[in-house]
A protein has these predicted regions:
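OB-fold and OB-like single-stranded nucleic-acid-recognition modules
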Residues: 1-125
Length: 125
């Protein structure tokens, strides 16, 4: 993926690498627009107006598969269903969120549209 593109396009096969990159170095994405496909996760806190698009990632072996998502502010978040596939286009900002217990990348949705599931529903490195 090209981090200097007007819209950083994250392909299905690049999700795990991008997720690690944006969570380890969020400041380099601050102010950027990103587009990626992911599954909807509902947040236990901040339910109103937020969801967490992301995917299941396997870092080592089957036992360590976990859902990795980013908090996303979206006015119609309540209309989304858990595990539904969507394409998200959003701007990135780095600020406090309880999910991180500190600062981290927060998405603000520009557009959220239904999507077909990824060919591989578990992303790997």
């Amino acid at each position: 993926f090209d981090i200097n593109a007007p819209v950083v396009e994250i392909g299905d096969d690049d999700f795990a690498l991008w997720y690690r990159d944006i969570t380890e170095e969020p400041k380099k994405y601050d102010g950027k627009t990103v587009r990626f496909k992911g599954q909807v996760a509902r947040l236990k806190k901040d339910r109103d107006g937020y969801f967490a698009p992301g995917g299941f990632v396997m870092t080592c072996c089957v036992e360590d598969i976990a859902f990795m998502g980013l908090p996303c502010k979206y006015a119609d978040a309540a209309s989304l269903h858990a595990r539904e596939w969507v394409t998200v286009e959003a701007t990135v900002s780095v600020r406090f969120h309880a999910l991180y217990r500190g600062t981290g990348p927060i998405l603000t949705a520009i557009r959220v549209t239904p999507a077909e599931p990824a060919k591989n529903e578990v992303a790997t490195f």
